[in-house]
Design a protein with these regions (language model features):
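Acidic, surface-exposed loops and disordered segments
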Residues: 1-113
């Protein structure tokens, strides 16, 4: 359901972040149903990934749920819950070498005054 993503099957913990489109639609209309609920789920996943890293764990974000109906059925999700992304979490199998961080000037662009 995650498109042959082995980390989900191998990880000791796999979290599924879901949206509730109807709840967002009730408050924000079509944008809530089609966009805001997905943004909320992905933001929650990003914070969970940061928390895992802070605990010394490693994680893999899988941001495409190719067969949401299969996930809904397999996890017995309530109607209205829409799986948006997965986060596989575990202890690192190895300690990879740290990569060089990009310079702030490569990431931030100032607007002219």
């Amino acid at each position: 359901a995650s498109g042959s993503q082995g980390p989900v099957a191998q990880a000791p913990v796999a979290l599924v972040f879901c949206a509730v489109p109807s709840r967002s639609a009730a408050r924000y209309g079509a944008k809530g149903e089609q966009l805001f609920c997905i943004q909320d789920a992905t933001i929650a996943c990003a914070y969970a990934q940061l928390a895992a890293t802070a605990l010394g764990l490693t994680s893999v974000w899988i941001g495409a749920v190719h067969e949401p109906e299969v996930v809904q059925e397999a996890l017995r999700l309530d109607d209205g819950l829409w799986p948006v992304c997965f986060l596989a979490i575990g202890h690192p199998a190895e300690s990879p070498e740290r990569t060089t961080r990009r310079r702030l000037s490569d990431l931030v662009h100032e607007l002219p005054r």
